């Protein structure tokens, strides 16, 4: 299959007190990934990320907490034939984190020892190794 286009998204690396990373699985999909999504018209990365965190997790991104971690590209997990390019930010959140909207499930994983679950290529190949290197 030929990869035809790239989807541009923002993604959040959220850690708990133990250093575990939050992953979510969207309804009707198999792969776990970072919370986040596509920018709406006129949004910058941080505004889009704050909106996505509110929509997906029901909590608020702490103002000024977004730390750019890099841009990464991989095969898209949920859109066959496409790639995803993500601007990844480490963020802090306020409030209780709970699946909302299209999120079916969320888990906290140790980036040094991720569980045997289906991971989005971007998460598996870039984000968890980045988080593990930062934690080691």
List each model region and its residues.
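The catalytic Nudix box helix
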Residues: 35-69
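Active-site-adjacent beta-strand/loop module that shapes the phosphate/pyrophosphate-binding cleft
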Residues: 72-98
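NUDIX/MutT-family hydrolases
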Residues: 88-90, 98-132
């Amino acid at each position: 299959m030929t990869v035809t286009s790239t989807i541009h998204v923002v993604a959040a690396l959220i850690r708990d007190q133990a250093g575990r990373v939050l992953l979510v699985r969207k309804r009707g999909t198999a792969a776990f990934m970072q919370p986040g999504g596509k920018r709406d018209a006129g949004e910058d990365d941080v505004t889009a990320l704050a909106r996505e965190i509110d929509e997906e997790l029901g909590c608020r991104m702490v103002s000024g907490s977004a730390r750019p971690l890099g841009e990464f590209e991989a095969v898209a997990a949920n859109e066959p034939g496409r790639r995803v390019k993500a601007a990844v930010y480490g963020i802090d959140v306020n409030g209780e984190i709970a699946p909302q909207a299209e999120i079916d499930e969320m888990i906290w994983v140790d980036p040094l020892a991720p569980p045997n679950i289906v991971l989005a290529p971007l998460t598996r190949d870039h984000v968890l190794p980045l988080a593990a290197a930062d934690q080691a």
